[in-house]
Amino acid sequence: FGNWIEQGLTWIIEHFDEPLWNITIVILLGVGLFFTITTGLVQLRLFPASIREMWFGRAAEGNSLTPFQAFATGLASRVGVGNISGVATAIALGGEGAVFWMWITAFIGMSSAFAESTLAQVFKIQDKDGSFRGGPAYYITQGLKSRCLAVAFALSLIFTFGFAFNSVQANSIVEATKNAWNWQGEYVGLVLVVLTAAIIFGGVKRIATISSSVVPMMALFYLIMAVIILGMHIDMIPTVIANIYKSAFTFQSAAGGMFGALVSKAMMMGIKRGLFSNEAGMGSAPNAAAAAHVKHPVSQGLVQMLGVFVDTMIVCTCTAVIILLSDNYGSETLKSISLTQNALRYHVGEFGVHFLAFILLLFAYSSIIGNYAYAESNIRFIKNKPWFVWSFRLSVLFFVYFGSVKSGNVVWNFADTVMAVMAIINLVAIVLLSPIEIGRASCRERV
């Protein structure tokens, strides 16, 4: 059965991935620029306010989430394989310049993240137990009055986060643990299925509780190690940064498609992996943003905007510089997580390989939990029946195991294809609803 799924996914990837991404790049950057301009550079003007809101936001009432818990749930999905394995893949396939395009995607995308999470708060609904839920499927239905488009988005999110992204997370766990401890993928996959089942049958509130306590600790440990490594090579950092900028505008190797030489591999891989990592404008974080109880809708827009900054500008940059400071960058045999692990071996010895395997295991597992939370919200939007939710949970467990035993190329390409569909639908929706976000932002600044 797994082989049939793999063959079907391969056919879809071969026929739809390239044309979808040609469209996605234009819309992603265009919408980000639109909101950057119309909000008056919100990612710079209100950046200090986003930090205050995240730390001092209103406490939860009933079963709703605090702003910090919603931030951590969003970060649980953002901070993960994309920051470690995704960055390595981008550099291996697109060169140093891919890092620059990850930065651009994040900076422009911060305004899109602000807009989509503000909308999630405006159009959220309250359940009988007092908790809130919402996201693109809800603001498309209520704001654009289009149930069909909302269901299409919900399905794209379910396939992207519930299935594809969780396959990627599981695949990266297997690769990292195999490199470090020679663990077999089949057994790792079974353990992941059991651990995931134990959490996803416990409720979204438990997911938020785990995320808010574990994710910041993981990110802190990883950043401490990164700062130590950067300090050891501080004299080389200016050269690394200069090479990133220089390579970003080298168009010798085109990505292909209708843009031809206008889109380099650096740009294509930087944008793909940047979007995978920070999810800005994709329509995922609004599902966590809607669950928060805040005084003003814009407050959660600011919090989720901050998540994009932390994810890409800090965590992804640390990974990139660690790789580019090593002596194995450019090796044709090292890609994905193995490139990052070998870079750490160069800097701190075998400890780095084992440390990264452990950190990535926690990162990726927390991402699986966060991804599930997003997808479950959309499953309930389509059909809020116990048997439907349980069927979805079993499907999630299948794809966790699927990613554990299949090749990295298949699961990464699957993720690229479905997240392009999801991003296109959401970006079009938030532009059509832009008067609401812009109006709320203006109102928030007057109070």
PLM segments and residue spans:
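Membrane-interface loop-to-helix entry segments
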Residues: I27-V31, F35-I51, N171-T177, Q184, ...
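N-terminal alpha-helical transmembrane segments of multi-pass membrane transport
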Residues: F1-V81, I91-A98, G109, Y401, ...
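Flexible loop linkers connecting adjacent transmembrane helices
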Residues: V42-P67, T89-I91, G95-V99, W103, ...
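Select transmembrane alpha-helical segments in multipass membrane proteins
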Residues: I25-V31, T66-G74, S146-T160, V188-V191, ...
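Extracellular/periplasmic helix-exit of transmembrane alpha-helices
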Residues: F114-K124, M225-N243, F251, A255-M258, ...
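Helix-loop-helix module between adjacent transmembrane segments
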Residues: F34-T36, T105-G130, P136-I199, F358-I368, ...
